[in-house]
Amino acid sequence: MRERDEQAFQRKKAEIMEACFNCYAENGLTGTGIQALADACGLSKASLYTYFDTLDDLIVQSTAYCMSKVEDDFMRLAPISPQDIQRFIDEVPYWTAKRHGKKYRLMYQVYTHPKYIEHGKRFFAGVTERYSAYARQMEPHLGIPCEVLTPLIFIFVRAAVHYALFEDEYYLKSQMDVLKLSVSLLSKQYRKEGQP
């Protein structure tokens, strides 16, 4: 029997996860059948089961994979200097809503479903770890302790995702205004404390 090229298999699996996730994002979790998924991938229904044990397995793996890519996309825009914070706060919620709004809606549809809630808890535990690590990385650049930065990041992300889900301008603007003020005041406070 011929051995499987594992790298090619994983590349194809990643393509399938993206195609299926995008199909679900366009049509909804309950509005998408296995035939629609197969069509989106250019495969037969049976071929999907070469890559995933069950439809639930496909849903869970594709959600985790695609949302980690969304998170990477988001973090590539993250500020690395104090001068970049205001731009980030002003621009990124609109960018993420336009680029990833449907994906966020699907993610919440999946991860709040009773069948998948434990997968959601694990995914968000990882998100918490990654954002906390980012805060530790940014502490020396921004001059704000990571224990203070981490909750600010969580507030920003929650408001940006809420906007991506519902496009609620008032909710976004009110939280971003408080966040900008907080960052400004905290930056001044910690700069002052750091002076001899």
Which stretches of residues belong to each language-model region?
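Hydrophobic alpha-helical connector segments
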Residues: 61, 74-101, 146, 150-153, ...
